[in-house]
Design a protein with these regions (language model features):
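Alpha-helix N-cap and loop-to-helix initiation/capping positions
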Residues: 58, 62, 143-151
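Generic structural signal for well-ordered alpha-helices
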Residues: 67, 95, 118, 153-157, ...
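Anion (oxyanion) recognition and catalysis
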Residues: 99, 160, 190
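Helix C-cap/helix->beta junction micro-motif
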Residues: 101, 124, 162-166
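Structural recognition of alpha->loop->beta junctions
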Residues: 119-135, 186-190
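Conserved strand-turn element in the central/C-terminal portion of the radical SAM core barrel
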Residues: 155-181, 185
């Protein structure tokens, strides 16, 4: 049996709308997300990057060679991701090439190495986005690293002490282990 339902009639305003413009192919790439390697210092429940066995890293010289092409594509910001970008053996050389080309840098980080690298982070990075997956106990459980929350808090404090104007924000992977604690995640971020 076929059931016919009345179809809504277009309103005069909707009927008079011009067609959408043709979309040209992507010719600009204002933000580039770069994975300089696949190492991580956490053992997160929801991620397997830490299981990677490759020791390969993106060389700073490669970035220097690619800069002209990136500038032609309109790259204005590079987001350093990973794993943990701060584990890259020549990260600051890589960042120096980006900075020299006038490209902004956002660092995504677990936060565990921010205390050690705070001076370089504020010298090279425009902003930092840390992973915060819950209040203390939940974050430590998800990250599977003892005192991960405490190390993150100390790292954020070190960055803010080195340069109060540097923006540090957080991101959270919502999952079974933390979805009931989202208000606490927001509270922990303050």
């Amino acid at each position: 049996m076929t059931i016919l339902r009345p179809q809504p009639q277009p309103t005069p305003a909707a009927a008079a709308r011009p067609p959408l413009p043709r979309v040209d192919p992507i010719t600009r790439l204002p933000i580039l997300i770069l994975f300089p390697h696949s190492h991580c210092n956490c053992r997160c429940l929801m991620c397997d990057i830490w299981r990677a066995t490759t020791r390969a890293e993106l060389a700073a010289a490669d970035v220097a060679r690619w800069l002209a092409e990136w500038q032609q594509l309109g790259v204005r910001r590079v987001v350093l991701s990973g794993g943990e970008a701060l584990m890259h053996s020549h990260l600051w050389d890589l960042c120096a090439h980006l900075r020299g080309a006038g490209i902004g840098i956002t660092l995504l980080s677990t936060g565990l190495l921010l205390t050690r690298h705070a001076a370089q982070v504020v010298a090279y990075c425009d902003d930092v986005i840390v992973s915060l997956d819950g209040p203390r106990a939940i974050h430590n459980e998800i990250r599977n690293i003892p005192r991960a929350y405490e190390k993150l808090a100390l790292g954020v404090a070190a960055v803010k002490a080195a340069a109060p104007a540097v923006t540090v924000s957080g991101r959270c992977t919502v999952q079974r282990a933390n979805y009931r604690h989202l208000r606490e995640v927001v509270h922990a971020a303050h």
